């Protein structure tokens, strides 16, 4: 039932994908039906708001000693359900740590409309991406990556973690230390750093931004 919309689709709709080798080498006019099963393709079960869910259910962040075991249990339940569906339908399902971008706002407004304002849960105009540590929590880059690595293991359909650092142009060894930690400890992560350039004076560094103007050192 989950693949009913894709059944009967012919390879001609995207020749590069289905006929020329990007995904398969089907004949013209051939349907993609046989590629929907037997592990060739995957249906992703995306999720977001693990932090908010944990606050609502336990009163604690999922980074707390009380919250983390519960959050991991919920993640394992999602994986168990995907395995159950796969066994029943011969279709691959996988849990996906969704990078929701603007959808975090849409989901937050929908939750507010349905449940009202709940402190720590629906009192912001966004929900936290996937398993991510909430942006307001004080946590260093290494601790964050190590914590989130446990949830990436339970997001086999895809996941990405982020760490924010200041301008590191003059501290490349520190950047390499973070990158090595990522390589050794987590499946996939991104390092975001600030590096600005002023086209008027040529300043290359970090520029302070306000609503009305830019401030250079």
Model-derived regions, located:
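Short, charged/polar micro-motifs that form catalytic or ligand-binding hotspots
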Residues: 36, 40, 61-68
């Amino acid at each position: 039932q989950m693949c009913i919309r894709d059944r009967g689709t012919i390879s001609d709709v995207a020749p590069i994908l289905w006929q020329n080798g990007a995904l398969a080498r089907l004949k013209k006019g051939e349907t993609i039906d046989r590629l929907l099963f037997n592990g060739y393709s995957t249906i992703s079960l995306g999720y977001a708001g693990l932090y908010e869910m944990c606050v609502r259910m336990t009163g604690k962040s999922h980074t707390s000693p009380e919250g983390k075991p519960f959050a991991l249990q919920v993640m394992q339940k999602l994986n168990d359900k995907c395995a159950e569906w796969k066994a029943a339908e011969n279709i691959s399902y996988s849990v996906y740590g969704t990078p929701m971008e603007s959808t975090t706002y849409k989901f937050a407004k929908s939750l507010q409309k349905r449940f009202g304002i709940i402190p720590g849960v629906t009192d912001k105009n966004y929900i936290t991406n996937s398993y991510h540590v909430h942006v307001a929590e004080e946590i260093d880059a290494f601790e964050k990556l190590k914590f989130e690595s446990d949830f990436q293991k339970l997001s086999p359909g895809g996941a990405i973690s982020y760490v924010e650092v200041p301008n590191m142009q003059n501290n490349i060894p520190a950047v390499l230390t973070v990158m090595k930690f990522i390589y050794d400890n987590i499946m996939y992560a991104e390092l975001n750093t600030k590096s600005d350039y002023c086209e008027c004076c040529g300043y290359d560094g970090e520029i302070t931004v306000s609503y009305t103007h830019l401030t250079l050192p």
